[in-house]
Amino acid sequence: MNRIILPSPAKLNLFLYINGRRADGYHQLQTLFQFLDVGDEIDISITTSNSTIELVNDIAGVATEDNLIYRAAKLLQKKTACQQGAKIAVAKHLPMGGGVGGGSSNAATVLVGLNYLWQTGLSLAQLAELGLSLGADVPIFVAGKTAFAEGIGEILTPCELPEKWYLVLKPNISIETSSIFKDPKLPRNTPERSLSALLAEDWGNDCEKVVREHYSEVEDLIQELLQYAPFRLTGTGACIFAEFASKAEAEKVFNCRPHNMYGFVAKGQNISPLHKKLNLFS
C-alpha cells in the first residue's frame, strides 16, 4: 500500500488540573481525554524515488518547518533512517487555537500513518515517546484510547467512559496555549488525586478562570448558554463544550447558538477513529 486516508480526530479535556510546574517550565497536570467522532482528514502518499516530505496545503502564517505535520514526518524519518518520502494533504475542519487538539492530532496521525506505510516497525509506545517531543498531547492521540494523563501528559492510564453526545462551540478568537500556561494567575497547586476520586467528583478546568478573565468572548458565551446547559472549557480554549443525553438535545442547543458561530455536535469515542480505521487494514 502506498496511499492511505486517515481521520485526525478531535479530543476534549473532560477535566484539567494543574498540580505544579517543573524546573524546566513544563507543567505537571492531571487530565482526562476523550476522542470525538469528528476531526480533520489526512491523505498520505509515500514516494520511493526520494525522501522529500511535501505538504500539499500549507497553513497560512505557519512556515513549513514549523508545521507539526512536517515535523512529525521528518522526526520519524530521522528516527528510523527511512529513505522514503511522502506527500501529505490535510482537509482541515478543526479550528486552530481551539483546545480540541487539531495540531497534536495531525502530528499523531502522520506518525502512525507513515509508520504503517513506510513499514518502519515502531510500536505505539515508541511513537508516543517520539511524539512527546512535538507536544504534550501527541502521545494520547498516538495511543488511541480514552485515558487519564499525568506528569506532563505522557503518563497514560486507559479508561472506559460513557460515550456521550457533546456540543462544542468556539467564539471567534484563538488562544495560544503558551500564553495561558505563562499567566501568573494560573492555579498551579491543585492537589493530585487518584483517578477513582476524580471520577466521583464534579469536573473542572484550572485554565478556565484565567481564560474567562482575559477573553470576554469566552465569558460572555458561557454565561449566555447557561440557560441551556453548563458549558466548560476544553484545554486552554477557546472551545467550550457541554454534554447531552442525546444527539437531538445537543442539536437543539446548537441551533440556538449565536449567529454563524463555529461549532459541531459530536459523540465521545473511547477508541480513536484513527485506530478504528487502521484496524480495518490489519
From Swiss-Prot:
UniProt binding sites for ATP: 95-105
EC numbers for this chain: 2.7.1.148
Gene3D superfamilies on file: 3.30.230.10, GHMP kinase, C-terminal domain (3.30.70.890)
Catalytic activity: 4-CDP-2-C-methyl-D-erythritol + ATP = 4-CDP-2-C-methyl-D-erythritol 2-phosphate + ADP + H(+)
Presence of keyword Nucleotide-binding: yes
Keywords assigned: ATP-binding, Isoprene biosynthesis, Kinase, Nucleotide-binding, Transferase
InterPro entries: GHMP_kinase_C_dom, GHMP_kinase_C_sf, GHMP_kinase_N_dom, IspE, Ribosomal_Su5_D2-typ_SF, Ribsml_uS5_D2-typ_fold_subgr
Molecular functions per Gene Ontology: 4-(cytidine 5'-diphospho)-2-C-methyl-D-erythritol kinase activity; ATP binding
Enzyme class: transferase
GO biological process terms on file: isopentenyl diphosphate biosynthetic process, methylerythritol 4-phosphate pathway; terpenoid biosynthetic process
Catalytic residues in the record: 11, 137
Pathway: Isoprenoid biosynthesis; isopentenyl diphosphate biosynthesis via DXP pathway; isopentenyl diphosphate from 1-deoxy-D-xylulose 5-phosphate: step 3/6
Source species, domain of life: Bacteria
Function description: Catalyzes the phosphorylation of the position 2 hydroxy group of 4-diphosphocytidyl-2C-methyl-D-erythritol.
NCBIfam families from the UniProt entry: ispE (TIGR00154)
Entry's family note: Belongs to the GHMP kinase family. IspE subfamily.
Protein name: 4-diphosphocytidyl-2-C-methyl-D-erythritol kinase
Gene name in the database record: ispE
